[in-house]
């Protein structure tokens, strides 16, 4: 009889969940959390945008509040049944960084909210909110964030845990540089508010901290006036030095007479050349140009505005059309709504989805390269590796940004060099499962070339598998990074998919 009472007590106290892969996680009923082991939910949480890895969690929770996450982490840190936890937004990682084998995935998209302050200078945003929804909500009040990633259908928390880069970085810095305050739940389950003045060690740690010190649940994002429209240009170059010289000149110009967005793209003759931005009458000319030269460089810029009749708009257009050294005749301009410009990649996503090409593996390689070595990088990587690849599929981005827009106190890394300008490189290739090893081999060859040539690159959205590589990556920040882990997540529960600790 005593044994029966004990069994009943145990059943009452514990909610025992066993996933389809045989991994068991015990959560006390008092936590009032529902751990889903539905096969479809587990399957979705086992994969990410990279479509390269499969890592199966023990279960997934959809929190109704930040308190749910706090209770989960307190139990994981202090309970008898220790398990690891990973926060996951849209799963836009490339190599399982937001995964946890046998542990618990916290579906951050279950917590969304955008509240604009009365003075419209900032918005308090729940970490599971998509950037596109932040844009929609803030634009209703005539304001918007000042820096953006190219793709807006990703979560605020996930982006800030990595850095957040795009074509506005040269002007306003990465997304992590435009945060005033955060709410974070540490690996001990503590719910803390942090900023540059309050708990700064946590604030600087989690921005670009790869989820190692806590789960961001709220971010206070800087806002400014939301322009109505954008004049969007693309210009073609056949000479790399001329191309980069014009890029660097544009990012050095003052705000009022300069552009608001700048990126660069590389067209390769062994890849797919998207000529759709240009008028139909010019598209065959663009394609022929790429065939003729092998490599063509695309300067892409935008100027935001409200009133097209303002003199400054004409002045900027004159600067672009009359003083830059692009190939004569190879310039195209679109006039689009501000929202449509920022959401442009989603349009391309829908096209790829309709063709069944979105769910392919994405062996992307993202790098920061010092300005002083960008020509060496171009010659050794673009000419001698990418152009000689059997076929290139996807985008190759290359554009400069100003180093002073980054805050070195944050975990986010860029090359530790004494230079004012660094280049952002995005080799955004896709591959069939059959071709994946070839593309991964190309990426390895690129990294090896940079190391052998002494080019002090830093990777972005990286995935290392050895502690030595992580120590090298964080460089002078490693000691602080390691100490912060011991301080805020001493049991190493958070974001194990990064393979750091």
Swiss-Prot record:
Keyword Flavoprotein among UniProt keywords: yes
Gene Ontology MF terms in the entry: cytokinin dehydrogenase activity; FAD binding; primary methylamine oxidase activity
The protein's enzyme class: oxidoreductase
Keywords: Endoplasmic reticulum, FAD, Flavoprotein, Glycoprotein, Oxidoreductase, Secreted, Signal
Cross-referenced Pfam families: Cytokin-bind (PF09265), FAD_binding_4 (PF01565)
Location of the FAD-binding PCMH-type domain: 53-226
Origin: domain of life: Eukaryota
UniProt subcellular location: Endoplasmic reticulum; Secreted, Extracellular space
InterPro entries: Cytok_DH_C_sf (IPR016170), Cytokinin_DH_FAD/cytokin-bd (IPR015345), FAD-bd_PCMH (IPR016166), FAD-bd_PCMH-like_sf (IPR036318), FAD-bd_PCMH_sub1 (IPR016167), FAD-bd_PCMH_sub2 (IPR016169), FAD-linked_Oxase-like_C (IPR016164), FAD-linked_Oxidoreductases_BP (IPR050432)
GO biological process: one example: cytokinin catabolic process
Protein family according to the UniProt entry: Belongs to the oxygen-dependent FAD-linked oxidoreductase family.
Name of this protein: Cytokinin dehydrogenase 2
Source taxonomy: Eukaryota, Viridiplantae, Streptophyta, Embryophyta, Tracheophyta
Gene it is expressed from: CKX2
